[in-house]
Each structure stands twice: as C-alpha cells, then as structure tokens.
Amino acid sequence: MNELRGELSIELGKETHEVLLNLNAFRLLCRDKKMELTALDEFVNSDPLDFVPTVIYWGIMNAQDIKGQPRPEVNYNHMSAIICSDLEKFQELSEAVGQSMGSTGGKEGN
C-alpha cells in the first residue's frame, strides 16, 4: 500500500482489489454522478457514508483502467456494506480518500 500516491487495496469477500485514487478516479466519479468537481466538497459533507465507498469504487475501476485491463465486476452495495460494517476499515479508507483529495487530516507540518 502506498497511501501517499493514493494506491491501496481492499478485500471484498475472497477477492482483493487494487485501488488508485487520483484525479482520474474523481473524474470518473463526477462523470457517473453527473456533477462538477467543485461539488465534491458538498457530497463529502452531506453524505460521507456514501462518499467514501463511491470514491473507493471508482478507485478500483481507475486502477484497472490505467493498466488497460478490464474492469472487475464489483457489487457496489456489497462493497459499501463491507466498508461501512468495519469502523476501522472505514476510517482507514476515509483517511486515504482525504489524502488523495489533498487533506492533511490534521497533520500539517509533518
């Protein structure tokens, strides 16, 4: 896992998926949600329990796109249930999403 580059992995059942959080992942998310990039702040603040899984989902798709490989079939609701059922996992992924968006998570100067 290389969180500083927005690279991590997530286990969904018996499968492990690579996640790549970069501008393209956010572009894919915005295109899917039919929203402008500037609306991400509103999305994260209004519904963080959906925002984090949504970013992770598009990070999974982005990781495959950048390698030129077919996208995996990921059931969004199943993935969200796994992420939201484990507070530690949710916090870890939230921090990774925040870092990919340029948030320092209270770690200024480090």
Where are the language model's segments positioned?
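A short, sequence-level motif marking secondary-structure junctions
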Residues: L21-R27
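Short, hydrophobic/amphipathic alpha-helical patches that form generic packing surfaces
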Residues: F51-N62
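Charged interaction scaffolds used for protein-protein
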Residues: M1-E11, T16, K34-S46, D50, ...
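Covalent nucleotidyltransferase core used to form phosphodiester bonds in nucleic acids
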Residues: R27-K33
